[in-house]
């Protein structure tokens, strides 16, 4: 696939999966055995991605990813984006689970790196997102980040 094809495939993935909630598209877009490098070894990336999309779309029914830049080198696309949405449902992710629905509008920075196979399916994913910013925007208490030194 060309650089243009891979960028188009990346944009289509965000639009169909996250913005529209098309969970069936995950099976088309993610290769069997794909690896999400932020999850424990052996995690079924497709199943996990469906769970994350459903969780985010429940919490933020107007979920949208704005893609700012995409860079492609070989079979890898790097993408900087901002996730936006209005907190209107439960968000059961880590320490944010159980927080009351805030109604807050959120903007959260994300970085994704996707590796594609020759058929245009994701085989590897590396990603980071600013969960602290999300937690603060929906009213979660700030974590205690103090470091104590031995006396």
Where do the protein language model's features map onto the residues?
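C-terminal and inter-domain tail/linker signature
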Residues: 1-151
């Amino acid at each position: 696939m060309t650089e243009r094809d891979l960028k188009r495939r990346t944009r289509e993935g965000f639009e169909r999966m996250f913005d529209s909630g098309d969970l069936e598209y995950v099976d088309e877009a993610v290769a069997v055995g794909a690896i999400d490098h932020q999850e424990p070894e052996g995690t079924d990336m497709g199943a996990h991605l469906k769970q994350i999309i459903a969780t985010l779309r429940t919490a933020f029914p107007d979920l949208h990813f704005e893609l700012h830049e995409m860079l492609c080198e070989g079979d890898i696309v790097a993408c900087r984006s901002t996730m936006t949405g209005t907190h209107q449902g439960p968000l059961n992710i880590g320490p944010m689970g159980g927080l009351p629905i805030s109604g807050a509008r959120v903007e959260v920075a994300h970085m994704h790196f996707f590796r594609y196979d020759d058929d245009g399916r994701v085989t590897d994913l590396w990603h980071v997102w600013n969960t602290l910013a999300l937690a603060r925007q929906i009213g979660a208490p700030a974590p205690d980040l103090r470091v104590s030194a031995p006396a």
